[in-house]
Amino acid sequence: MNSHSVRSHIHESTRALKNCQMPRQAPVLPVGAPAPPPFRLASRQTRQETTVVNAGGVAIGAGRLVVMAGPCSVESRPQIRDTARRVKAAGADMLRGGAYKPRTSPYEFQGLGRKALEWLAEAREETGLPVVTEVLNQDDVDVVAQHADLLQVGARNMQNYALLRKLATVEKPVLLKRGPSATIQEWLLAAEYLLSGGNPNVVLCERGIRTFETAMRNTLDLAAVALVKELSHLPVIVDPSHATGKRSLVPPMARAAAAVGCDGLLIEVHPRPDEALSDGAQSLDVAAFGALMSDLRAEAKAACA
């Protein structure tokens, strides 16, 4: 290559560099400023005040402990209506009940589906208790949203991103349970799918994680409740029933959850737990639930004294 060719090549290369679009530099954070977390929309850096989620007229995250109670599974119309009346009389704010059940074994009771949704809606009409129930896949979202006030994503579905994207489009609040092996960041990033997709009404639920311990069904991570309340503006509730798997442990862990500042409790209650079609071992009977509610009220009153 002669000198003229070299000069021409350099000239062309310089002109090309001037005309090319260089990527814009990322903004530089001030010295000492915390880096934004990956869960931007769920972070308290984005929103300082706790989000208050309205579920059928019940405010979750407003500073008062919200109690959601009812059977693991809706088994019959009389069962769910009787349970609804009795948990309301004891002081529950919302009615829980499973219509679609994601069981570990395919041979276990899988729920009554749409029929159970209709019975839940009837119980709400009679008692005035808003309904929380689980949705398993995106094909069922619309029908569940027609009957329920708070749509639950179970622990097994925390990272079902197709389901989360669908739930982000509905005008109903979502209760997002933590997966049994999920880190706190993974849990909050799952919530980010809902928030970034357009649904700002998200409630988080700690329901125990899987550890080496086998004496209980799961290990209730109360430290996570306190930490997530620091990291995120989303309200956090606790499910002491699934967290322990033993009805004798539900009341003390419910009180402990309230003590660390959770925004609500999700408690399984059955009129005859020993006859329940699912999770009877962790379900309180109505009398035990009433006693727990009395204890929670007394402790709340003492805390305010």
Go through each PLM region and give its residues.
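N-terminal amphipathic alpha-helix/helix-capping segment at the start of soluble metabolic enzymes
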Residues: 6, 10, 33-68, 301-305
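Conserved anion-binding
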Residues: 99-103, 156-223
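Glycine-enriched alpha-helix->loop->beta-strand junction motifs that scaffold or abut catalytic
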Residues: 91, 143-152, 168-174, 195-201, ...
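Hydrophobic faces of well-ordered beta-strands that scaffold small-molecule active sites
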Residues: 66-71, 93-97, 131-133, 151-153, ...
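Active-site mouth loops of central-metabolism enzymes
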Residues: 65-80, 106-110, 130-134, 155, ...
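Alpha-helix-loop-beta-strand connector modules within alpha/beta enzyme cores
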Residues: 109-133, 167-173, 222-236, 282-304
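N-terminal active-site wall of soluble small-molecule enzyme domains
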Residues: 102-148, 152, 160-163
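Glycine-rich, proline-tolerant flexible connector loops at the mouths of alpha/beta enzymes
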Residues: 96-114, 271-283
